[in-house]
């Protein structure tokens, strides 16, 4: 346990030294406050509209940003150490590969987690301070759900980055694979499901299609945050289809957490067999 904590502390200190957490936090604050006040500018309105609209807009934006940030943070976690010669050095200590992987994941995982809490938490405080007649309980619940689910989404893609890093032999290969999986989960997956739905004229197994959304952590993330919001009544396409999923929110939370565990287990399985 001490070895895991030591590795985690080193990774966190490296992240703080590189100012990743500060940069991500500031980005999230600016985006959240900007969307809250200028999200409806296209319709000629400026100012805070509603909690539901703000969270819905933030969810759509975070679906693109958070996976990309997580992949950029961790794509070289294993292969980078190997190329630099430090991986072999680390493994000469009384430290198993599993301890090394878990320690690095915990340390690096704290960076986007703390940045998400600080960034979006500060935005929620700013909204509460500047908007009168606001239901603070609704604001707290909506942003808490959004922050926790954003952390889980980031961890899922960070675990995926560890799997890619354990598989790749060069950092450039890991970077290319990371970009590829980002395109797949954020853009291509939903487009393929929509194409399937259109090609079948809406007749492709209406019972099966909503369950296919569970194969993409970004779709699970969107369903967690948009289900129950007034903005959810205006959902179209696959998001509207996901509302017919016969599973409650607890199941969605569980599946998103399972994504993190399974991907991290696969990363360990590949790392344990990686030649050094």
Predicted regions and their residues:
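Long, hydrophobic alpha-helical segments
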Residues: 58-80, 112
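A structural motif at transmembrane helix-loop-helix junctions in multipass membrane proteins
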Residues: 151-186, 192-201
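Aromatic- and glycine-rich beta-strand/loop motifs that create alpha-glucan
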Residues: 1-25
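Start (N-cap) of specific transmembrane helices in multi-pass transporter permeases
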Residues: 10, 14, 99-112, 116, ...
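Terminal transmembrane helical anchor/hairpin motif
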Residues: 41-48, 183, 187-253, 257-261, ...
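Transmembrane helix boundary and interhelical loop/hinge segments in multi-pass membrane proteins
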Residues: 71-91, 105
């Amino acid at each position: 346990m001490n070895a895991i904590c030591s590795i985690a502390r080193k990774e966190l200190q490296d992240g703080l030294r590189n100012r990743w957490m500060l940069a991500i936090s500031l980005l999230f604050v600016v985006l959240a406050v900007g969307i809250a006040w200028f999200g409806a500018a296209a319709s000629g309105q400026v100012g805070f509209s509603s909690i539901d609209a703000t969270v819905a807009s933030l969810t759509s934006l975070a679906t693109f940003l958070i996976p990309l940030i997580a992949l950029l943070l961790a794509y070289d976690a294993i292969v980078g150490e190997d190329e630099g010669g430090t991986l072999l050095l680390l493994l000469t200590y009384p430290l198993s590969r599993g301890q090394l992987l878990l320690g690095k994941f915990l340390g690096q995982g704290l960076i986007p987690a703390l940045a998400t809490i600080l960034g979006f938490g500060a935005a929620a405080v700013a909204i509460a301070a500047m908007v009168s007649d606001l239901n603070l309980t609704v604001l707290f619940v909506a942003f808490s759900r959004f922050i926790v689910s954003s952390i889980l989404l980031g961890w899922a893609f960070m675990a995926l980055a560890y799997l890619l890093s354990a598989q790749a032999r060069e950092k450039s290969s890991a970077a290319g694979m990371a970009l590829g999986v980002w395109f797949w989960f954020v853009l291509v997956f939903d487009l393929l499901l929509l194409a399937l739905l259109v090609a079948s004229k809406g007749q492709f197994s209406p019972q099966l299609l909503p369950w296919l959304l569970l194969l993409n952590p970004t779709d699970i993330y969107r369903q967690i945050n948009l289900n129950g919001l007034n903005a959810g009544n205006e959902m179209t396409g696959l998001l509207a289809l996901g509302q017919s999923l016969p599973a409650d929110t607890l199941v969605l939370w569980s599946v998103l957490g399972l994504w993190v565990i399974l991907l991290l287990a696969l990363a360990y399985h590949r790392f344990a067999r990686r030649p050094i």
